[in-house]
Amino acid sequence: MIDLIRLGDTTDHGGSVITASQTMRYAGRRVAREGDLVECLLHPEVQPNIIIEGDRRITDRGIPVARQGHRAKCGCSLISSLV
């Protein structure tokens, strides 16, 4: 299953992914990685709110790519628009 997180994908806290790879794309959208930024509507005080998990089997220049269910620093889960 392709469940990559990409720029603009949402979270279970109502936010979205706001930064992503400059080099890796899937289906026309930039792929999010560990360390990329997330906006969280429930926890705006968490700054920087970065993606803290990634799949080490899929990397972009050595940085693990985020997938469905991975989390950001505020605790929200990422939701892939591909599933």
What are these model-predicted stretches?
Residues 1-83:
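Intrinsically disordered, low-complexity proline/glycine-rich segments
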